[in-house]
Amino acid sequence: MPNDRSVKRSVTVLGAGLAGTEAAWQVACAGIPVTLVEMRPVRRSPAHHSSDFAELVCSNSFGALSSDRAAGLLQEELRRLGSLVIRTADDHAVPAGGALAVDRGRYSAALTEILDQHPLVTIERREQMDLPEVDAVTVLATGPLTSESLANDLRGFTGRDDCHFFDAASPIVHGDSIDLNLAFRASRYDKGDADYINCPMNKAEFLAFREALLEAEQAELKDFDQESAKFFEGCLPIEELARRGEDTMRYGPLKPIGLWDPRWGDVNDRDVRRAKRAYAVVQLRQEDKDGRLWNLVGFQTNLKWGEQRRVLQMIPGLAQAEFVRFGVMHRNTFLESPQLLDPTLQFRTRRHLLAAGQITGTEGYAAAVAGGWLAGTNAARLVRGLDPIALPNTTMAGALTHFVSEAPTKKFQPMPPNFGLLPDLPERIRDKRARYGAYRDRSLADLEPIRALIPEPLLA
């Protein structure tokens, strides 16, 4: 492949989500012309609300910031690799306790403007109906909402039906419609500032709320069988959690542990704590820079919009909530990547074609960015006649790309960043936080040889 004279001297990136945006930037910054193809607004998807690049359709959070957490380690790796998408997230961060969350409108608009102004980036607003010609270096980053025509061509090329699951997004409410006489500001265990709004429930309120969720009418989903619906376990609809058992929500998004309203009394008084602590707590996270919009954390849902209003207004503090956006559910498509891709994210049967992002079977925003970084970097290297690179599997980014290219395929499912993907440490460390810190230290050290390959301007 290196020095292949048939390779075109430019790159095409299909899809301007998180992965495609990062891939296009890496190609352009390597001095290679890149065409970024995005079907919005010519063709809308069921989940997007704008035509801007890298729109966050589920949560506005990239996950934990701390580098001794899996998501935080991946973010730090990407910062060190010169990721535009993560750097811009840092620039547009909103308060979210120990997490990296962004003002999603300003964030996407900023990334769109940056790419639009780059002299080597050509943006084409159109639907790509099929894969480009064989000798074109192409990054497939069309995401979980790949259009049907392109998905059909992809099935013909791979000889495989796509895998899929159903994903959902949480509702968003106006902050000034939240009753802070009932709700309170705090972060769990008082970590960071009081960045969340918390709506406490007693047992009777929780049980009535769960019953309402179970009885509420769901929206009809197109093109799928209700009985065989597959959900991603990391983004289950709240009504699905309610169905799984009385306490499932209380050990998930509604867990009350570590949350205390000072108006209840002294948290250090055991009797007060036992008498006053909440049975369950609904949390809302700031959605925009100005704190006017708040999303219900973990409240992905497929309820009809009228039912969402009725049921969610049962939550203490949200009786008069004004909804900016209701929750929606959509089908997510991904490749059976272990049968198709190498750790370089090249297709094994077509080396000029690379894939990145959620379509490869990684889960989470930072994971999509990591795939975009690697695919874009390797696309540029192919055009320049250089060997593509694979990231060390001791890094979180490398562990994810090795997983999607090597995992057993009996039941391949999307995978988020997690320390279980990393090879064992040389010595066993019993303390979990210390162990995760050791994983981090090894990862960042092993990333240094890769950083040496990156042009200096990208590392600034």
UniProtKB/Swiss-Prot annotation:
<dbReference type="Pfam" id="PF01134">
    <property type="entry name" value="GIDA"/>
</dbReference>
<comment type="function">
    <text>Catalyzes the folate-dependent formation of 5-methyl-uridine at position 54 (M-5-U54) in all tRNAs.</text>
</comment>
<keyword id="KW-0808">Transferase</keyword>
<dbReference type="GO" id="GO:0047151">
    <property type="term" value="F:tRNA (uracil(54)-C5)-methyltransferase activity, 5,10-methylenetetrahydrofolate-dependent"/>
</dbReference>
<protein>
    <recommendedName>
        <fullName>Methylenetetrahydrofolate--tRNA-(uracil-5-)-methyltransferase TrmFO</fullName>
        <ecNumber>2.1.1.74</ecNumber>
    </recommendedName>
</protein>
<keyword id="KW-0819">tRNA processing</keyword>
<dbReference type="GO" id="GO:0005829">
    <property type="term" value="C:cytosol"/>
</dbReference>
<keyword id="KW-0285">Flavoprotein</keyword>
<keyword id="KW-0521">NADP</keyword>
<dbReference type="InterPro" id="IPR002218">
    <property type="entry name" value="MnmG-rel"/>
</dbReference>
<feature type="binding site">
    <location>
        <begin position="15"/>
        <end position="20"/>
    </location>
    <ligand>
        <name>FAD</name>
    </ligand>
</feature>
<dbReference type="GO" id="GO:0050660">
    <property type="term" value="F:flavin adenine dinucleotide binding"/>
</dbReference>
<dbReference type="InterPro" id="IPR040131">
    <property type="entry name" value="MnmG_N"/>
</dbReference>
<dbReference type="InterPro" id="IPR036188">
    <property type="entry name" value="FAD/NAD-bd_sf"/>
</dbReference>
<keyword id="KW-0489">Methyltransferase</keyword>
<keyword id="KW-0274">FAD</keyword>
<dbReference type="InterPro" id="IPR004417">
    <property type="entry name" value="TrmFO"/>
</dbReference>
<comment type="similarity">
    <text>Belongs to the MnmG family. TrmFO subfamily.</text>
</comment>
<dbReference type="GO" id="GO:0002098">
    <property type="term" value="P:tRNA wobble uridine modification"/>
</dbReference>
<keyword id="KW-0520">NAD</keyword>
<keyword id="KW-0963">Cytoplasm</keyword>
<dbReference type="GO" id="GO:0030488">
    <property type="term" value="P:tRNA methylation"/>
</dbReference>
